[in-house]
Design a protein with these regions (language model features):
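Conserved phosphate-chemistry cores used by DNA topoisomerases
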Residues: 1-241
Length: 241
């Protein structure tokens, strides 16, 4: 906001700060998500090194060993399931401390990644969609995608309007998969495959380049997701979108 800059090291700290503004949120502030080091400018790097934030990790012997082993040992999948069952989305790591225990980092910080990884990778039982597919569908509704558009162009729209933080190459692939209608692909393809979207013989891997193929909403989507229901939907807010 103007010359003011506030840094947050996790979503929990940011959400707590955002809630201090009430229902309207932090008006006037520009919110920027830093995906990796490449997001930072040269001036920001100079500031990072001028104000180094160094946190020491504390090792607690067997307790730390067991916690680390539980997360990375392939044979302890059942223990990880119990760990994820106890997930609290409101718990987060206090980054103001100069030292943290390995257990604290894993149970209050890494667990957010592991839970989100499951949400991204496993279709939801309610609608059968993963997060990326739901963002694609949301963007299609927002754009009123009733006429065809190039897959490559649509992926750019999705990335801009749904706070998609991952590569557009994977987003292109998700859109292509969402439109495939050969036997063994989708029970119902929510997008139309206007072009060569791959074949059963190659498992869809022979789809043409996203620059050459087009898509649009399948008319059946209006029956599955009636627009009259949208006012009842609970929308997720991400990056102020």
């Amino acid at each position: 906001k103007g010359a003011q800059v506030k840094l947050f090291y996790n979503d929990g700290e940011y959400n707590d700060w955002k809630e201090t503004f009430g229902e309207d949120g932090p008006k006037g502030w520009n919110v920027k998500y830093f995906k990796g080091l490449g997001t930072s400018t040269s001036a920001e790097f100079k500031d990072y090194f001028a104000n180094k934030k160094i946190v020491d990790f504390v090792y607690n012997g067997k307790s730390s060993d067991d916690t680390i082993d539980k997360i990375f040992n392939k044979k302890r999948a059942d223990d990880r399931k119990v760990w994820l069952e106890n997930y609290d989305k409101n718990a987060y790591l206090d980054t103001s401390h100069s030292s943290i225990q390995y257990e604290q980092f894993i149970n209050n910080e890494m667990i957010h990644f592991s839970t989100y990884d499951c949400a991204r990778s496993i279709p939801n039982m309610v609608d059968g969609l993963k997060i990326s597919l739901r963002k694609i569908l949301f963007s299609a509704f927002k754009r009123k995608l009733t006429s065809e558009i190039k897959v490559a162009q649509f992926s750019g729209y999705v990335s801009e309007h749904s706070a998609y933080h991952h590569g557009e190459a994977s987003l292109n692939g998700a859109i292509v998969n969402m439109a495939q209608n050969y036997v063994g692909s989708n029970n119902i393809n929510l997008l139309k495959p206007n072009g060569q979207f791959g074949t059963r013989l190659m498992g869809g891997a022979d789809a043409a380049s996203p620059r050459y193929i087009h898509t649009e909403l399948n008319p059946i989507v209006d029956k599955l997701f009636p627009s009259l229901d949208f006012t009842l939907s609970i929308f997720t807010v991400s990056n102020s979108i």
